[in-house]
């Protein structure tokens, strides 16, 4: 079976605004490209890349999903830190991750295109390029239509469909835990994840209207090169 990776990234005024990937059969290419073309709300630059997949691994999804709501971002962030400590992340390291996303992870101000890689022991940022970060690519659901229908029926959103796949690949590649909330000013739900705590949706992790957001991957320094290689090179299809 021939599979193709379809990746889209879009920018506006030089800033990353949208990105997504689908891994599909040849006969599904046109549909996938059209879907990704319509994904960004606004942009002045878009790049769509189609690549034939050489090797891939099918992995069974095994994360539990939970949802928690709070009265304020402060309460929600405290809970996020608590859940991360349950995954073995030191409290001060988890708090540092929250602070980085709340202030804007890009050292020059604003958001990063990719994720922060944070040392689980020291809280030090390990990504080589601290403006771009590291992006998780080359992953999708084996049967995206089936997964989407199931999750929507259970009350989840399309965002959750994509986020679950992304964070599952992260954990598969050796990321110990993840903290994420969107840079979309209108979307205030985020999550933490780990093999023990599962995928934990938390709202609101920021105030409505706040344009800052991003991802922090908590990683072991000694496994850094292997993790980055897996995140950026290995093709993973996830089976629900």
Swiss-Prot record:
Catalytic activity reported: heptanedioate + ATP + CoA = 6-carboxyhexanoyl-CoA + AMP + diphosphate
What EC designation does it have?
Answer: 6.2.1.14
Biological-process GO terms, alphabetical: biotin biosynthetic process
Q: In which pathway does it act?
A: Metabolic intermediate metabolism; pimeloyl-CoA biosynthesis; pimeloyl-CoA from pimelate: step 1/1
The record, for InterPro entries, names: BioW
Q: What is this protein called?
A: 6-carboxyhexanoate--CoA ligase
Assembly and partners? Answer: Homodimer.
Q: Which gene encodes it?
A: bioW
Q: What does this protein do?
A: Catalyzes the transformation of pimelate into pimeloyl-CoA with concomitant hydrolysis of ATP to AMP.
Which top EC class is named for this enzyme in its record?
A: ligase
* Family label: Belongs to the BioW family.
Give one GO molecular function term.
magnesium ion binding
Q: Which residues cross the membrane?
A: none
Which organism's genome codes for this protein? Answer: Aquifex aeolicus (strain VF5)
List keywords of the entry alphabetically.
ATP-binding, Biotin biosynthesis, Ligase, Magnesium, Nucleotide-binding
Q: Which cofactor does it need?
A: Mg(2+)
Which HAMAP family does its entry note? BioW (MF_00668)
């Amino acid at each position: 079976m021939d599979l193709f990776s379809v990746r889209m990234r879009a920018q506006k005024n030089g800033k990353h605004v949208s990105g997504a990937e689908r891994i599909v059969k040849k006969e599904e290419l046109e549909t996938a490209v059209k879907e990704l073309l319509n994904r960004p709300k606004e942009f002045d630059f878009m790049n769509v890349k189609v690549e034939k997949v050489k090797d891939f691994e099918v992995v069974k999804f095994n994360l539990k999903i939970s949802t928690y709501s709070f009265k304020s971002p402060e309460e929600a962030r405290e809970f996020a830190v608590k859940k991360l400590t349950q995954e073995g992340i030191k409290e001060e390291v988890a708090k540092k991750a929250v602070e980085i996303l709340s202030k804007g992870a890009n050292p020059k101000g604003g958001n990063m295109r990719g994720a922060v890689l944070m040392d689980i022991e020291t809280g030090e940022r390990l990504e080589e390029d601290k403006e771009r970060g590291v992006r998780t690519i080359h992953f999708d659901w084996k049967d995206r239509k089936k997964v989407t229908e199931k999750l929507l029926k259970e009350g989840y959103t399309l965002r959750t469909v994509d986020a679950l796949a992304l964070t599952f690949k992260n954990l598969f590649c050796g990321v110990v835990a993840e903290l994420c909330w969107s840079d979309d000013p209108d979307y205030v739900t985020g999550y933490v994840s780990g093999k023990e705590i599962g995928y934990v949706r938390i709202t609101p992790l920021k105030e409505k209207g706040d344009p800052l957001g991003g991802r922090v991957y908590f990683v072991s320094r000694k496994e850094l090169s292997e993790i980055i290689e897996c995140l950026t090179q290995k093709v993973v299809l996830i089976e629900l």
